[in-house]
Design a protein with these regions (language model features):
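The canonical Cys-X-X-Cys-His
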Residues: 44-55, 111, 133
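C-terminal capping alpha-helices of c-type cytochrome domains
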Residues: 109-110, 117, 121-148
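Soluble non-cytosolic domains of exported or imported proteins
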Residues: 38, 42, 93, 123-128
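Extracytoplasmic electron-transfer domains, predominantly the class I c-type cytochrome c fold
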Residues: 69-119
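Sequence context of c-type cytochrome heme-c attachment sites
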Residues: 13, 24-35, 84-89, 114-119
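Short cysteine/histidine-rich zinc-coordinating motifs and their immediately flanking basic loops
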Residues: 60-66
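Post-cleavage N-terminal segment of exported redox proteins
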Residues: 1-34, 137-151
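Sequence/structural segment immediately N-terminal to covalent heme-attachment motifs in c-type
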Residues: 35-49, 71
């Protein structure tokens, strides 16, 4: 009986490898993507772009189910929440809300996700990088909505 269960589990794990997931990156239109200070871009690309842009670097383990399902879902959710590749196309009221949320999540060390950091230690932000990024996010917020109270 135990042998049949193990064979069944192995069979399921093999079969789910054939479930297709779109791991391509949509084309990046440079005219609408984020362009800002080089230091900010360096932090964003290191710590945020895999989930929050159309420039995801799909790792080898992102092709292995069931882990691939979770990674694909996280990228899809991340892009929907805030996509730096579509920065200039985001409506102002939505951008304000997303900037506020980004400030909160970066300040509270909720981003990058701990599961992501466990596999990508290089994406971890130093406290200085976190402060620099939050300051930039706050400045972006002030630029697009100077009369609004944020914090």
């Amino acid at each position: 009986m135990l042998k049949k269960i193990i064979i069944g589990i192995v069979l399921v794990l093999v079969l789910i490898q054939f479930i297709p997931l779109d791991k391509s990156n949509p084309k990046v239109d440079e005219s609408i993507s984020l362009h800002t200070d080089e230091n900010i871009m360096k932090i964003l690309k290191k710590s945020c772009y895999d989930c929050h842009s159309n420039e995801t670097k799909w790792s080898i383990y992102s092709k292995i189910a069931p882990l691939s399902f979770k990674i694909h879902s996280n990228v899809k959710i991340g892009r929907a929440a805030l996509n730096f590749s579509n920065w200039k196309d985001i409506k102002q009221d939505i951008k304000i809300a997303r900037l506020k949320r980004a400030i909160k999540t970066v300040n509270n060390k909720m981003m990058p996700l701990s599961a992501y950091l466990s596999l990508h230690e290089e994406a971890r932000m130093s406290s200085d990088e976190r402060k620099i990024l939050v300051k930039w996010l706050e400045n972006e917020l002030r630029l697009i909505a100077p009369d609004e109270v944020y914090f």
